[in-house]
Amino acid sequence: MGIPKFFRWMSERYPLCSQLIENDRIPEFDNLYLDMNGILHNCTHKNDDHSSPPLPEEEMYIAIFNYIEHLFEKIKPKKLLYMAVDGCAPRAKMNQQRSRRFRTAKDAHDARLKAERNGEDFPEEQFDSNCITPGTTFMERVSRQLYYFIHKKVTNDSQWQNIEVIFSGHDCPGEGEHKIMEYIRTQKAQPSYNPNTRHCLYGLDADLIMLGLLSHDPHFCLLREEVTFGPASRNRSKELAHQKFYLLHLSLLREYLEFEFQECRSTFTFKYDLEKILDDFILLAFFVGNDFLPHLPGLHINEGALALMFSIYKKVMPSAGGYINEKGVINMARLELILLELENFEKEIFKAEVSETKNNGNSDKPSFDFLKYITESTNDIKAMTGEQKNYFLQIKKFLSSREPFIDFSANISSVDQRFLRRLCNDLHLSFSKIIKVDGTHLLRITFRDLEFNDEDEDEIEQDEIERVLQKYDNIPLLNEEQALKEKNVEKDFIQWKDDYYRSKVGFSYYDEEALKAMAERYVEGLQWVLFYYYRGCQSWGWYYNYHFAPKISDVLKGLDVKIDFKMGTPFRPFEQLMAVLPARSQALVPPCFRDLMVNSESPIIDFYPENFALDQNGKTASWEAVVIIPFIDETRLIDALASKDKFLTEEERKRNSFNAPTVFSLAEDYTSFYPSSLPSLFPDLVTRCIQKPYSLPSMEGKEYLVGLCPGVFLGAFGMVGFPSFHTLKHKAELVYHGINVFGNESRNPSVIVNVEDVKSALTSEQIAMQYVGKRIFVDWPYLREAYVESAMDESYMYLASNSTIEKRDLAEIEKSQWGRKCSHKIREYSKRFGVLFGDISLLLQVRPIKGLEYTREGALVKIFNESVLEDYPAQLVVEKIAIDDPRFTEREAPPVEVEYPPGTKAFHLGEYNYGRPAQITGCKDNKLIIWLSTAPGLDAQWGRVLVNDSKSKEKYYPSYIVAKLLNIHPLLLSKITSSFLISNGTKRENIGLNLKFDARNQKVLGFSRKSTKGWEFSNKTVALVKEYINTFPQLFNILTTHATKDNLTVKDCFPKDDTQQLAAVKHWIKEKGINSLTRVSLDEDALDSDIIKLIEEKASTIDSTYQVPKKVFGVPRYALLKPSQTRGILHSQEFALGDRVVYVQDSGKVPIAAYGTVVGIMLHHLDVVFDLPFMSGTTLDGRCSPYHGMQVEVSMVLNVTNPQFVVNTRAGKNRKTNVSANNVSQGTDSRLVTKPTSTFPSPPSPPSSSVWNKREHHPKPFSLHQVPPPESLIHKSKSKFSKGNHHSTNGTQSIRGRGGKRGKPLRSKELNRKHDHIVQPMGKLQIN
């Protein structure tokens, strides 16, 4: 099914399922699974963009690495990272893969021809995305790079060192997501499986939702990029840091589906089981779309097809006797009930199409109203023919007899057969077709076995049968005219289907054998897909050998098929390549096979047509068209390839084989040399990562578990961070509500949750007294802890004051705000989230939790964000949760020797050598002994000086001054500096400069900014607009005349030769690089590329010579900063543009101890340009050199220009009057060490031939664990890379920041106890 369409439908029907990831407000996860093919496509090419030159391949690799790192940092898995690349797929999937690849190649070819016809530039070389197919040299190279990347991360990144990493590459058979599900399915069958394992699966396919649901693990989320529609999907930043991600919570989707089918609790005549309803839901979704079978005609997700399936399911299941999907096996008799109801729907589609044809002469798209059909159609029989009345009376007599069955001829009309099926369904009878020994075909009706057989159930069943018989007794007979009309309708209906089969598959509806074979193949396909999802691939060779599905009513003809799949084996990589690639992608297959794709004498040349038909088949989007190409004959393909096998090289033979997945882990006492996967770019590694083949646990004597695991936590008792509606008392219903998720109100129904006010009997004052000054949980249903600082009703404010609550009257302005706040909250929750909670009597003002903070003694205490005060209706807060979040658990200080064992990495917070790397070697008398990387004095102020000097030369003028300077109308200036759209027929053309964006609250760095008085523009803007005016004076004469006029047309602006003049304007704007200018939020303070270039030039001159470390004794714990402590200490730092910083985490994309300069400041993040390049570095949207930039959280770096955590040392005092040469120790022990001991070996220098020798940071003080590789494997010459990046800071720097303006924390312990924190806002700490 279409991904955007399904996501939109689901988001509007179940509006709280998806959660935007903001900061770290997500659950903790044990396992992260990456469906890698989506990442590969994202990082190698743009969708449908054939005009851009391809990226260099090394940039693709780095983009892939960055994407993996970015997702890892978002989720931070605790136990497992599983990366799965698509391997050779089952034949059933190859049909779709083959169609997509043929279409991709044809689209690229057509785009080139179109560009040539229009005289447009087109790149000579293009990236063929078809290379992302198992067996290509590109995929082999990607695997090699990923192996290197994993070794690098496990060796250097602390967050990768305590987990298991599994990589399943293109040489492991199976689709990526199904390899992942096989892993989960097998693990779940093991006795040691934790039923509360927390899963996160990244991927773009809609079927991942189904795979997640069928796991029946409630602690399961899907991670995906933001889905945008319309203009919002364009003009995005290229920086990965700016990409929004969503979590789709299957815990909430499960509960939404429980709401969806809640009426079934009272209507089912068998045991209600949500897990089995979820299994049925998965099967129903297959009818709307899947990757293995064409969709049934007329069922479209965006038109309400799933809602229709739900409606039919609720209607027929009460009499079904059980569920349709029985642990992955289809109950055909129960599926038949669904298909019978769908047959009535198909007739309505037919009538709508006939009506549309008569009215408009166009039957391509039936004007059928799904919603009206679902809500108004009862499908009750309005009248019966004489024959049908006779059949009814015979069955009525049969019910009162003691006969076990009754038979009818199988030759009765299809209309009468449908009547009998419907009657049997209503009477809970079984309807089937049989063949007697003599070959006679009969329709047999028998009593259906019931799940319950007690007397009460028998009595209920009998009462229902009596009601049905009474209803049919009262159905009138059709008169002759009506009967004739019905026959004609049926005749036209058959002809409609006959036209379909003749045009789509080349045989007639009346060819019963061919139609039955097609229907049986489709039903066989449904079972194959269900097996594939629940048990894994049950046949590698099976596939659906038609381009189209049968009509819905004809699927019934295939329900008697005998299912018998033969497992077979997967295609080898080259067989898959030759099966799915078009001739236009022949360069991707081994040379010896290419002739088979293009030579007219090739025995399989018919597999590779250059031209082929596309059939929209009722779909609207061009990419949804059916590609009409031949199916692959497996035997012919393999025979043809066998004749060429002898010409394969040894490397190609290796690439044509299968391998097992690989598992990676850290070995503490192991080091090995790992050669570069790309010597021109990456250095060799000294790795501590070991790899070995991975195999799944044995399933011998075990069965796959379908359903909930024993011991799983559900609902309000689920694992922390996994949302549930059950934390508050509520009800839910499916109604038309006009939910607005994507900017427009939905016309489809949504599940609306109505929260009950359990405190309605209390006054607002009583409720306030219960909550104010307490900790509660807000953001229902996701929940996060918060501190209630105050509360307000329409008359009073209630505030926490020491140990009491103060009540005061509202000021007049507060009274006026009360009504607006309440109405805004009610509307927001109602229209965006589908939550109703009645009127608001009390609003709580809360400060959300910010995290944990370290005290000076090393304890952890909660802090609440003092810069954020949020309003929440009292009805939507939760007082307690079942499981506390371990991420916010306070703790006492551990002993020094426990928290700082030998070998611990840290950063020094002493006055001298502030921010320099250090390493713990021991502990004595509750004080630490460290090796400290000292550095000579260096000015840490140069960044600020450079920025201030550059900004002093950058003049900005109010817009009215600029208008005067340019001698144009102020309104014209506003238009021309914005997006200025003029009409060109049905299109809109932009002749504006896009230098300001009011609606988006964005400015363009170096060109515009907005003050409290309005927009201001720089000299650059003045010069650019002046050039625009001088280049097109006639245009501006016209625009000046019409400065106040809206809705200008191209003809208005260019009266003569409008097409050529418009093209000239657009070309000029393009040549000026307007679209490449950097847009940022108005709130963001950032530097443009010109200033950043000066910063990079200055940084390149800094001496980064490695310094001999000094041994320092008597260092207190609060004079050191461990990487694991950064969030709890550095969260309130202040920064200014130009500040010098050092990266102080031992995980993430930036090398530890890397120095850089702040070039952008946001609320929670900084843009930093680092002195030396590193593998994951970016260009910060084109503002800095490649591999230098990165957006980091404020707590990831230590500000060394403005030191805010300085600890005074005795050595620091002594140094002011008696400065030693190079060996001054710091701390209370003044013993000096002139050189390191033998336990501090000099780390190895990477090979000099690597470009990364000049780019990658090499933090020497943190390389104690490394052992040099064999001398013969190391390149002899040294490189710049081996110098590292440990720039020293100014030893006499005296600036002391107060910290806290970014949100001074509100601490816990009743929030009034004072702690002696390591952060001393009024000055330095004194070491005694």
Curated annotation (Swiss-Prot):
Spell out the Polar residues composition-biased ranges. 1217-1231
What does the record give as cofactor? Mg(2+)
**Compositionally biased region (Basic residues):** 1275-1286
Region feature Disordered, mapped onto this chain: 1211-1328
**EC top class named in words:** hydrolase
Activity regulation behaviour: Strand exchange activity is enhanced by fatty acid synthase (stimulatory factor P190/210).
CDD domains in alphabetical order: PIN_XRN1-2-like (cd18673)
Q: Which Pfam families match?
A: SH3_12, XRN1_D1, XRN1_D2_D3, XRN_M, XRN_N
Sample GO molecular function, one term = magnesium ion binding
Record bears the keyword Membrane: no
Which keywords annotate this record?
Cytoplasm, Exonuclease, Hydrolase, Magnesium, Nonsense-mediated mRNA decay, Nuclease, RNA-binding, rRNA processing
Q: Where in the cell is it found?
A: Cytoplasm; Cytoplasm, Perinuclear region; Cytoplasm, P-body
Q: Name one GO cellular component term.
A: cytoplasm
Mainly localized where?
Answer: cytoplasm
Provide the E.C. number(s) assigned to this enzyme. Answer: 3.1.13.-
- Mention one GO biological process in which this protein takes part, according to its record: rapid tRNA decay
Q: Is this entry keyworded RNA-binding? A: yes
* Protein function: Multifunctional protein that exhibits several independent functions at different levels of the cellular processes. 5'-3' exonuclease component of the nonsense-mediated mRNA decay (NMD) which is a highly conserved mRNA degradation pathway, an RNA surveillance system whose role is to identify and rid cells of mRNA with premature termination codons and thus prevents accumulation of potentially harmful truncated proteins. Involved in the degradation of several hypomodified mature tRNA species and participates in the 5'-processing or the degradation of the snoRNA precursors and rRNA processing.
The record describes its quaternary structure and partners as:
Monomer.
Q: Which PANTHER family match?
A: 5'-3' EXORIBONUCLEASE 1 (PTHR12341:SF7), 5'->3' EXORIBONUCLEASE (PTHR12341)
Q: Please report which protein family the annotation says this sequence is part of.
A: Belongs to the 5'-3' exonuclease family.
Please give the name of this protein.
5'-3' exoribonuclease 1
User: What is the primary gene name for this protein?
Assistant: exo2
